[in-house]
Structure formats: C-alpha cells, structure tokens
Amino acid sequence: MAQKIQKTNVCRLLDAAGVEYELIEYAVDEADLSATHVAQQLGEDVDAVFKTIVLEGDKIKHFVCVVPGACEVDLKKAARVSGNKSCKPIPQKELLPLTGYIRGGCCPIGMKKPFPTYIDETCLMHEKIYVSAGQRGMQLRLTPQSLIDYVPLTVSDLI
C-alpha cells in the first residue's frame, strides 16, 4: 500500500476554502534549493515552477513577489508596483520569524501575517503552475487563477 502524503498547513487552508490543487512530493537536495532543481525533480518546465520572494521596501515595509523559477525579481518593477521607491530581498535570517517559512519552503499562502503579494503576469501563460506547499520537498500544482483569487495576488510585470 502506498504511503499517504502528509498534508501541510497550506493544504489545510486550501481544503477549507474548497480550492482544487495537487500536492506533489520531490526529493530535496539541501545543497541545491533552487527552483531549477525542483523543476528537474518534478519533470516540469522551470518557467511553470514559481518561487516566492519576500522583499522590504522604503515605504511598504514587507511585501511578496511570486516569479518564475528561472527568473529574478526586477527590483525596480517590484518597487513601482508595491508603492515603494526602492526595495530589496529580506535577509534570509528574517524569513522564518517574519513568514513562518524557511528558504526553499516559502509559500504565498498562509504566512504569519498577510502581506501585499504580487505574481508575475507570465503565470497566466500556464494552465497549471507550481508553488511551494509550505515546506521543502512539497509543491502545490494548481491553476494560476485559483492562487490569484485565494491569496489574493496582484498580477504584475515583475521580471
């Protein structure tokens, strides 16, 4: 009998809201937590695997950007859409206390506090996208619109 995948808190939130998703496990390589590695493990295009980046701005203290795995957030674009003049990624040591997530497991769903959250417009080119399920080794596969509606996300040009 196959072992049942243990659901994450993110999954429980989506279940409670009636959001359809697929939970997928993959082998974690602690030396390579990149979205490219995750995409290889999933056998998917890295452009469909989105990563969650937490930023701090000069006006809006903290906000979140969700971008395709092979891309970097354009900080000028991120600052503009978030109402900041400038922004930068938060230091890694601040990620867990601020969001409740660790690097490689950060998800735009279920953070400790709600932050303004933006997703790159390229998400709409995919029928389904992947985002972390809230812990390393687990990804959610869902429609971009489901994610946009649930969080909620603002669709923007971020790359």
Regions found by a protein language model. Name each.
Residues 1-159:
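Extended, low-hydrophobicity, polar/charged segments
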